[in-house]
Amino acid sequence: MIKLKDLITEAAQLSKLQIFSPGTGGKQSLNWKFNPEKIPTGRLNVSSMVQYGGMCHNKPVGIFWTSSYKQKFKGSAWTDFKKKRFPKWHSSMGAVFELQSGAKILKIRSHSDYMKIQEKFPLDASKKCPSGHMYMDWGKLSKKYDGFQLAGSTMSIPMLGQWDVESTAWFNMRKLKFVGTTKV
């Protein structure tokens, strides 16, 4: 049986460098520029997308997204995904962050990992969404952990279907230090 404590990843087990790549889908899809003066600070105010906007996506809102930075290739799983699948989302630069020690991050690798975490942080959205009884309460989870990492694709984790590739949702910005920008 998987225990929740087995899913906690220490900072040393994550990629030391993380990258934030501006730009996403939607109506305002464009080549956004990163402004270091606008990096969020401290513990972020996190909620669940289904609570915030009513959309049936099991994702946190109010967080800071990164993906493990591959220096040799000047990118990450997320920047590669955007280039290949959604070229309009691609931005030509990324902001690199160094992971600070002591970060407490939940790392999910499988559907059983997800179910174990969801059991501890349930959110009932069944009145609004299909399978709504299996949603995560991101606000509660964010108060106990610094981040939440999806270790790979969501293909085997149906409840995280809107997370396409390896990425980390950060709840506590004190665990990331901005080191500069790079072309991706």
Model-derived regions, located:
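A composition-driven surface/loop motif
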Residues: 50-59, 64
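Short His-Asn-centered micro-motif
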Residues: 65-68, 151
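Charged/polar, solvent-exposed surface patches and flexible loops
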Residues: 6, 75, 79-80, 140-143
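Active-site and NAD+-binding cores of ADP-ribose-processing enzymes
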Residues: 12-52, 82-184
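Short acidic, low-complexity intrinsically disordered linear motifs used
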Residues: 1-9
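Short active-site loop/helix that positions an aromatic residue
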Residues: 70-87
